[in-house]
Design a protein with these regions (language model features):
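Structural signature of FAD isoalloxazine-binding scaffolds in flavoprotein oxidoreductases
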Residues: 32-44, 70-88, 135-166, 180-187
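Anion-binding (especially nucleotide phosphate/pyrophosphate-binding) glycine-rich loop
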Residues: 2-130
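Gly/Ser/Thr-rich beta-alpha loop segments that engage phosphate groups in nucleotides
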Residues: 34-35, 66-70, 74-77, 104, ...
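A generic local secondary-structure boundary/capping motif
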Residues: 68-69, 109-112, 120-124, 137-144, ...
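Phosphate/pyrophosphate- and phosphate-bearing ligand-binding catalytic cores of soluble enzymes
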Residues: 18-19, 25, 155-274, 278-282, ...
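Hydrophobic, well-ordered secondary-structure segments
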Residues: 105, 109, 123, 127, ...
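A generic alpha-helix structural signal
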Residues: 5, 9, 46, 50, ...
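Short, well-ordered alpha-helical segments in soluble proteins
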Residues: 112, 130, 134-138, 153-156, ...
Length: 301
């Protein structure tokens, strides 16, 4: 690790490398132990960082806005790369919008609206970035990334850039081919539909109101904790199992929306994980349905 640090500082003197960086600062759950090494690079720095990490046998974890993650209390070994503020450019040409992987979905939706382009209204309130949204085919209120993606540029494990069409991405409910192939999303190109800006903004405002009314936005969470089982709603199954408000330490099933697990203050990853397991067991016993986590678990628990 020290050798990697030495070499990366020589190769990229302007890159800031954080050591023992608390991951709770970088996840919307506000939990997670320290990352051994943490960087937030520019696009052109990525091949150098990844190449050196591979050469030194350093484990690499890539995150975006940290909005769909549960990081273990013992943190993450090796190197964490945040694709974020240094990679968030958004540009519009005609009905095509290009967004770098670190661009926030709210930023992308606002830019699309300003250009009179519809199709991203559903994403305005999703607290994620473009890279994560593509990776998990994020969606809400009847829309999903699959509807608007034209193509995506990724970095392969061999540090080669590759362009994937929508078909090649193999998009389905909360799934794409990105994770299993260990690709890193660099940029997404979206094909949007011209529409009056006023109509687009009205739709965005309507969906924002729904979120505020129905979701526990006042507490740290990772959004929907479980995937929607075929033919059911996770929140309804959890409520029917008598788990509204159920808590383990400072982790709690939201009383406002049972599909959300919230951090009431100082929850640990262990408490959240235990609560999720309890919910899965009770729901399985009550309804026979197996709930699958939508939240991605990384690091050491």
């Amino acid at each position: 690790m020290d050798q990697w640090l030495e070499e990366i500082r020589a190769a990229l003197p302007e890159l800031v490398v954080y050591q023992q960086e608390p991951m709770k600062k970088h996840t919307t759950f506000r939990v997670g132990g320290p990352a051994d090494l943490y960087v937030c690079p520019k696009k052109q720095e990525l091949p150098v960082i990844l190449g050196l990490a591979k050469k030194k046998g350093l484990a690499v974890t890539v995150i975006g806005n940290g909005s769909n993650l549960l990081v273990g209390d013992k943190g993450i070994r090796g190197l964490v790369i945040e694709v974020g503020a240094q990679m968030n450019a958004v540009e519009v040409q005609g009905n095509i919008l290009r967004a770098q992987a670190g661009a926030l979905l709210s930023q992308v939706a606002t830019k699309a609206a300003a250009a009179g382009l519809g199709g991203m209204e559903f994403a305005a309130g999703i607290p994620g970035s473009m890279g994560g949204a593509v990776t998990m085919n994020a969606g809400a209120y009847g829309g999903e990334m699959k509807d608007v993606i034209r193509q995506v540029t990724v970095l392969t494990p061999e540090c080669e850039q590759k362009v994937l069409s929508r078909e090649e991405l193999d998009l389905s409910y909360r799934h794409s081919c990105i994770s299993k192939n260990h690709f890193l999303v660099l940029e997404a190109e979206l094909s949007l539909t011209p529409a009056p800006e006023q109509e687009i903004r009205a739709k965005m405002a309507e969906l924002r109101e729904k979120r505020v009314e129905k979701q526990p936005l006042e507490y740290p969470s990772a959004g929907s904790t479980f995937k929607r089982p075929e033919g059911y709603f996770a929140g309804k199954l959890i409520m029917d199992a008598g788990l509204r408000g159920y808590a383990v330490g400072d982790a709690q099933v939201s009383e406002k929306h049972c599909g959300f697990v919230i951090n009431r203050g100082n929850a640990t990853a262990a408490e959240i994980l235990q609560l999720m397991k309890d919910v899965q067991e009770r729901v399985k016993k009550q309804s026979g349905v197996t709930l699958e986590p939508e939240v991605k678990m990384i690091g050491e628990f």
